[in-house]
């Protein structure tokens, strides 16, 4: 286990792969069909294989923001924390910036719409804590450190190790306040109804993230929330 780290004694690459691996058998074929049909209503045409690749990508890469230098500097090379109060606060912003600017969907006519959905999904994967409306367009959040969105160093290591897992070769970079401002400003001007479909991608992220984390940190115990998500995705929910 080496940097980048997802948590104490947990590598980020292991967490990325683990979050998707634990979904095996937990998402029904009907759920993928629901995503495909819902997208098609808004002119976003993706066959089932395309939908599955997109779900895999967003689950595997949902914690890209944790590759920020600020977070990684809290750990040694073996993911042992260098201080007791380490934190990944605001890491969802780095993940969102990566998907908004540098994620490249598989061949689809409305690629920008797809990127918007995945961006919202990763930005809201901590939606019990923060939602997009909590962020101000013209300033970083309180106690934000720009090193939190410097992703090139460790994010590139992550992407290199995930080649063959995600759908295509991708790049990541260090992001800036201008990137943050422009992304949030663009979303503040959007009112398209299709944007609500981000929830269809959010559910697999949250299930994979919570399941893998519980296996690593809590000896496999499941919360009631995780059980609800399992039921929704395996039952072909219409979230």
Curated annotation (Swiss-Prot):
The protein's name in its UniProt record: CRISPR-associated endonuclease Cas3-HD
Example GO molecular function: metal ion binding
Gene for this chain: cas3
Activity relative to temperature: Optimum temperature is 50 degrees Celsius. Expressed as a fusion protein to increase stability.
Naturally occurring in which organism (per UniProt): Saccharolobus solfataricus (strain ATCC 35092 / DSM 1617 / JCM 11322 / P2)
Effect of residue 63 to A: Significant loss of endonuclease activity. Complete loss of activity
Domain HD Cas3-type residues, every copy: 5-195
Residues binding Mg(2+), per UniProt: 63, 92
Entry similarity comment: Belongs to the CRISPR-associated nuclease Cas3-HD family.
pH dependence: Optimum pH is 3 and 7-8. Expressed as a fusion protein to increase stability.
């Amino acid at each position: 286990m080496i940097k980048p780290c997802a948590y104490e004694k947990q590598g980020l690459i292991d967490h990325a792969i683990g979050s998707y691996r634990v979904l095996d058998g937990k998402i029904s074929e009907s759920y993928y069909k629901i995503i495909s049909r819902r997208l098609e209503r808004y002119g976003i045409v993706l066959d089932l294989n395309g939908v599955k690749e997109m779900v895999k990508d967003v689950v595997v890469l949902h914690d890209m923001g944790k590759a920020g230098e600020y977070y990684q500097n809290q750990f040694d090379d073996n993911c042992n924390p260098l201080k007791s109060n380490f934190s990944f606060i605001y890491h969802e912003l780095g993940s969102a910036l990566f998907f908004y600017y540098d994620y490249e969907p598989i061949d689809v006519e409305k690629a920008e719409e797809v990127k918007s959905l995945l961006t919202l999904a990763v930005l809201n994967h901590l939606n019990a804590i923060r939602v997009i409306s909590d962020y101000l367009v013209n300033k970083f959040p309180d106690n934000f450190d720009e090193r939190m969105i410097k992703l090139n160093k460790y994010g590139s290591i992550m992407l290199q190790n995930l080649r063959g897992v995600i759908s295509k070769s991708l790049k990541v970079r260090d992001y800036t306040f201008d990137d943050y401002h422009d992304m949030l400003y663009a979303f503040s001007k959007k009112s398209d109804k299709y944007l609500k479909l981000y929830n269809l991608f959010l559910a697999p992220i949250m299930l994979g993230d919570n399941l893998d984390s519980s296996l690593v940190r809590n000896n496999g115990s499941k919360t009631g929330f995780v059980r609800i998500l399992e039921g929704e995705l395996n039952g072909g929910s219409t979230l």
